[in-house]
A protein has these predicted regions:
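Conserved PLP-enzyme active-site core in the AAT-like
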Residues: 2, 14-18, 79-311
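Short hydrophobic/aromatic beta-strand micro-patches
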Residues: 222, 344-346, 406-408
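Conserved small-domain helix->loop->beta segment predominantly found in fold-type I
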Residues: 271-274, 279-280, 285-289, 294-296, ...
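N-terminal "arm"/small-domain region of PLP-dependent enzymes with the aminotransferase-like
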Residues: 2-61, 69-70
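Active-site beta-loop-alpha junctions enriched in small/polar residues
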Residues: 156, 185-187, 322, 348, ...
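Glycine-centered tight turns that cap/initiate beta-strands
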Residues: 76, 147, 313-316, 363, ...
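Conserved N-terminal alpha-helix of the aminotransferase class I/II PLP-enzyme fold
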Residues: 39-88, 113-121
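PLP-dependent enzyme catalytic core of the Aspartate aminotransferase-like
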Residues: 119, 128, 146, 293, ...
Length: 427
């Protein structure tokens, strides 16, 4: 279906015809842990990867399979793997690339959970990270060491929606024989397809825009199918016979998608952060309206940014659509259809004024999620980034008067009225 437009792909990929067992047009929920093999040879072929069908619910599920194919198609990749959460997708992507004594280069302005993973959790297992200013290409390249195994960035940073030059960073990574891993959670494949700009692996928290309704946890890894794992020689667990899987060479068993096949066959098998068929079904419902929702998110965000910039209680707004934003040119290059509906602004005052504003809102919900159809708000310095010192917070552009907004799809007049009354309550 590669010739179809995005809006068609989001509805049909993975289930081009009605369900063969029931003639159901909607994707069924396959609530099963296991699958019957036709005979002993059929079972052996499944386990050797000679046959790519279902083995066990921790690895694959027919509902999950449709979701994986659909997201991979929307991203322009060769295959996808759905897992239990966005955090699981990120952990698996890094674990599949780096071992004890090895190293990652990462953008410093990334999601706080990912930053904590790279800065504190993975070093306990011997994997270290150098955090860099992704806008400083010389700094990015200088951070690469002989033991570096990947470069990791986000299409839109969290929480300030800063934008790296993906094409340039991909060039640096590939010049050093490294895969580029990109978190496209905030970008979504509707607004930007990182693979077209050089990404080798794309990860998502499907909990966010893909699901879109704040109901379901899930994560996705997409294999671009472009990285030369065999030629690299730096990832023998993918390119050479793997002793934990009967000597399978994933580059030969799954030549178009060896990376996600390795993650599924080894890491998901052993660590088990699998997605449930119910979650996959709910995320499919979100996927089918992704383009419609993103258009409304973008329209509403534009109006909110224009409103905040002019409000006397607002000190500054960090949104790349603004001409004076340092990433404005990159925003126009990579996001011609708009976006960045998760962004921050600084209220005049400090922590007390920020709390007063947040507690005065009526439509906006105070919670840790983002990218919901409902508008959301949070104070990053005391919540999502609370583990950072004031110096570390400032280093990633967060202050005590910083407020993160996630603009939903409510009527724009109601959103603006709520923001206005809450800002006026602080005066």
């Amino acid at each position: 279906m590669s010739n179809y437009h995005f809006e068609t792909l989001q509805l049909h990929v993975g289930q081009e015809q009605a369900d063969p067992a029931s003639d159901a047009r909607a994707v069924p929920i396959y609530a099963t842990t296991s699958y019957v093999f036709h005979n002993s040879q059929h079972a052996a072929d499944r386990f050797s990867l000679a046959d790519s069908g279902n083995i066990y619910g921790r690895l694959t599920n027919s509902t999950q399979d449709v979701f994986e194919k659909r997201i991979a198609a929307l991203e322009g990749g060769t295959a996808g793997l759905a897992v239990a959460s966005g955090a699981a997708a990120i952990v698996y992507a890094i674990q599949a690339l780096a071992r004890q004594g090895e190293h990652i280069v990462a953008q410093k302005t990334i999601y706080g959970g990912t930053s904590n993973l790279l800065a504190h959790t993975l070093p306990q297992y011997g994997i270290t990270t150098t955090f860099v200013d992704a806008h400083n290409l010389e700094e990015v390249e200088a951070a690469i060491q002989p033991n570096t195994k990947a470069v990791y960035i986000e299409t839109l940073g969290n929480p300030n929606s800063d934008i790296p030059d993906i094409d340039a960073i991909a060039g640096i990574a590939h010049r050093h024989g490294l895969p580029l891993v990109i978190d496209n959670t905030f970008g979504t494949p509707y607004l930007i397809r990182p693979i077209e700009h050089g990404a080798d692996i794309v990860v998502h928290s499907a909990t966010k825009f893909i699901g879109g309704h704040g109901t379901t946890l899930g994560g996705v890894i997409v294999d671009a199918g472009t990285f030369d794992w065999a030629g690299s020689g730096a990832y023998p667990w993918i390119s050479e016979p793997n002793p934990s899987y009967h000597g399978v060479q994933f580059t030969k068993a799954a030549p178009t998608a060896p990376f996600v096949t390795y993650v599924r066959a080894i890491l998901l098998r052993d660590e088990g952060a699998c997605i449930s068929p119910f979650a996959a079904f709910l995320l499919l419902q979100g996927t089918e309206t992704l383009s419609l929702r993103l258009e409304r998110h973008a329209e509403n965000t534009k109006r909110v940014v224009e409103f905040l910039v002019k409000h006397p209680m607002v000190e500054s707004v960090s949104h790349p659509s603004l001409p004076d934003h340092p990433d404005h040119a990159l925003y126009e290059k990579y996001f011609p259809n708009g976006g960045a509906s998760i962004f921050t602004f600084r209220i005049k005052g400090g922590r007390e004024e920020a709390f007063k504003f947040i507690d005065s809102l009526k439509i906006f919900s105070l919670l840790a999620n983002v990218a919901d159809v409902k508008s959301l708000v949070i104070h990053p310095a005391s919540t999502t980034h609370a583990q950072l010192t004031d110096e570390e917070l400032a280093n990633v552009g967060i202050y005590q008067n910083t407020i993160r907004l996630s603009i939903g799809t409510e009527h724009i007049d109601d959103i603006l009225a709520d923001l206005d009354q809450a800002l006026n309550a602080v005066k």
